[in-house]
A protein has these predicted regions:
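Extended, low-polarity segments enriched in aliphatic/aromatic residues
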Residues: 2-53, 57-61, 67, 72-80, ...
Length: 373
């Protein structure tokens, strides 16, 4: 496969060129205007952020993108699907309220905001791809029915996939609630009894009441209630909750790649990633821990695989923030420069496997040329 072009701009500004201007210049240079947007419904896939989390992409960027697309003749809308876990984005009413709380509304975003899989997450299209792991991914109807897909991705760490970028935003984010259940279906966690301290944090934070402490003061999971969302794995500071046997981060990343293929199949698509506020974990949490590296910039490409690889490489090469974050607080952190920061934070994950599978199924290539704008 040929090398893909990934365009990048840093975050330096001048009075005549602010960050919104730089983003617009970046995507134009990357060729977004080569897509025929005339009278096309364009889904701008973005994560609205769980209330309390402040690392999500600012709505100002979404508004500038919507205005640019409308000027190109498009009918854009911001969109995301409901969550599997029962937080404040698990149904369309709460999800829209959360989006508005975080600044996403038709006035600020310059376009409508649509929850793609409907009120209760039951509105979806099955898109047949005959994948190795997913035969017919369940994609939110508003996304499946859109003519063009634009992803706006906050690049950060992720407790189950290593990092979250374009593939995660598209593959997991565009899945309906039932689709997310399929993605997580083989990834129910387990309790390592020897490591469990009985601290009760997983019990307190399980939104499905699937965990309790037994008579030995050890956590136990009720697999009849567990949906495999993995929040207990992310919360546990003692490696007491871990990925289940017979399942791996690799398998989840494989499925995400195949869901991404379903989302993009047969449609023009373009992707922008914001390498800012690179927090250790997903924006689905109601908090965001301190960034692990300095803010780096914005990148764009027609190839989501190349884009994710370029962003990962930049974060790995970047210096660790000097103080006050998960990596700088680690012993001997001065020796971690140039190491795989995602694996350091989440040692049970393997983000490389997802990119390899995405490449295998034709989503793009990991070979890229980085062009600075």
């Amino acid at each position: 496969m040929e090398t893909s072009k990934v365009y990048f701009t840093n975050l330096r500004t001048t009075p005549s060129s602010n960050l919104l201007d730089k983003m617009e210049r970046l995507v134009k240079r990357a060729g977004i205007a080569n897509i025929d947007f005339q009278n096309q419904f364009v889904a701008i896939k973005i994560h609205f952020g769980e209330p309390g989390n402040l690392a999500f992409i600012r709505p100002n960027y979404a508004a500038r993108m919507a205005t640019l697309l409308r000027n190109l003749g498009a009918k854009p809308f911001l969109t995301d699907c409901n969550t599997l876990y029962s937080g404040r984005r698990a149904n369309a009413v709460d999800h829209l309220e959360s989006a508005m709380e975080n600044g996403f509304n038709p006035f600020s975003a310059k376009c409508d905001v649509i929850i793609a899989d409907g009120l209760k997450g039951t509105e979806y299209r099955e898109i047949e791809i005959d994948g190795e792991y997913c035969k017919a991914p369940k994609i939110g109807s508003a996304i499946a029915d859109a003519d063009i897909i634009i992803s706006m991705n906050h690049f950060k760490g992720h407790e189950q996939t290593g990092f979250g970028g374009a593939l995660k935003n598209l593959g997991m984010g565009c899945a309906s609630v039932g689709g997310k259940l399929e993605l997580h279906s083989a990834s129910q966690p387990r309790i390592d009894i020897e490591s469990c301290k009985g601290c009760n944090i997983c019990v307190k934070h399980c939104r499905h009441d699937a965990i309790h402490l037994n008579a030995s003061h050890k956590a136990e999971i009720d697999y009849g209630k567990c949906v495999g969302c993995g929040q207990c794995v992310a919360l546990c500071q003692y490696d007491g909750a871990v990925m289940g046997e017979g399942d791996t981060s690799e398998r989840l990343n494989y499925k995400i790649a195949e869901y991404t293929k379903a989302v993009l199949s047969g449609k023009p698509n373009f992707h922008i990633s914001f390498i800012m506020n690179v927090s250790p974990e997903c924006d689905c949490w109601n908090h965001n821990d301190a960034a692990i590296v300095p803010d780096l910039g914005i990148a764009a490409s027609f190839d989501p695989v190349a884009l994710d690889k370029a962003c990962a490489d930049m974060v790995i090469k970047a210096p660790i923030q000097e103080t006050g974050n998960r990596l700088s607080d680690a012993p001997h952190h001065e020796h971690l420069e140039g190491c795989d920061k995602f694996h350091l934070m989440h040692p049970d994950t393997n983000w490389q496997a997802g990119l390899e599978h995405a490449e295998k199924i034709g989503l793009g290539t990991q070979k890229y040329e980085l062009i600075t704008v």
